[in-house]
């Protein structure tokens, strides 16, 4: 194999690495966006249903809400 063919092969192989990193970065970002910010909890001991939602994550506000939509709106801030 001549040196020019070897050089072209090396350039092609090296060019695949950024494409692989780009694909993995995309999947990491999409997973990060899909993480829930609220966790369903039981606010009433008499009721066995998960009726409330509380903030979770790296910086939780230790707040619980009657609905998941209220929790999501406040916890994302």
UniProtKB/Swiss-Prot annotation:
Keywords carried by this UniProt record: Disulfide bond, Signal
Tissue specificity comment: Expressed in flowers.
Top-level lineage group: Eukaryota
Keyword Secreted: no
Disulfide bonds: 38-54, 43-75, 52-71, 55-64
Residues annotated as signal peptide: 1-22
Coiled coil regions, renumbered to chain: none
Presence of keyword Disulfide bond: yes
Annotated family: Belongs to the MEG family.
Name of the protein in its database record: EMBRYO SURROUNDING FACTOR 1-like protein 9
Source organism of this protein record: Arabidopsis thaliana (Mouse-ear cress)
UniProt gene name: ESFL9
